[in-house]
Amino acid sequence: MLRTMLTAKIHRATVTQADLHYVGSVTIDADLLAAADLLPGEQVTIVDINNGARLETYAIAGPAGSGIIGINGAAARLVQPGDLVIIIAYGLMDDAEARRHVPKVLFVDAANRIIGHGDDPAEPLPGDPSSLRGDIPVDIPVDIPVPTAAAAVRSAMATQ
């Protein structure tokens, strides 16, 4: 059996352009592609934080260091310049590989420069008190340190 696993996430990127008449895809700064280990042509899911739109397309490389996140083609009707998006890639893995796999998670600033990275898909944006972990209920007080989700999974796997 193959499992579909998160391989990369670029969190809270700012859309810099949208071109309805372009053939399709999402243009991503080549430096971000490399840091996230994404290839041109690789399938990605884009989640628009502003309006909830969710779409699938493929990545193409934009100029390195430009900060470009460009939504191309029909998706430009769903995502506008200035919107915050999460760009997600998934990969198929056999069970053993999936249990060892560590995703790449990038955090970017408003200019789409990398400000942090990690391997915990539930980690909130560093230094942003309005971002919450995705794996802790918000109505239950937590007064003990919570290990990252990735570390907890690896720890659980090591004891099996």
From Swiss-Prot:
* Pyruvic acid (Ser): modified positions: 25
Keyword vocabulary terms for this entry: Autocatalytic cleavage, Cytoplasm, Decarboxylase, Lyase, Pantothenate biosynthesis, Pyruvate, Schiff base, Zymogen
Post-translational modification, briefly?
Is synthesized initially as an inactive proenzyme, which is activated by self-cleavage at a specific serine bond to produce a beta-subunit with a hydroxyl group at its C-terminus and an alpha-subunit with a pyruvoyl group at its N-terminus.
EC top class, as a word = lyase
Q: In which pathway does it act?
A: Cofactor biosynthesis; (R)-pantothenate biosynthesis; beta-alanine from L-aspartate: step 1/1
Q: How is the cofactor bound?
A: Binds 1 pyruvoyl group covalently per subunit.
**Does Lyase appear among the keywords?**
yes
The catalysed reaction is: L-aspartate + H(+) = beta-alanine + CO2
* Complex formation: Heterooctamer of four alpha and four beta subunits.
Protein role:
Catalyzes the pyruvoyl-dependent decarboxylation of aspartate to produce beta-alanine.
Its name, as the record gives it, is Aspartate 1-decarboxylase 2
Protein source organism: Frankia casuarinae (strain DSM 45818 / CECT 9043 / HFP020203 / CcI3)
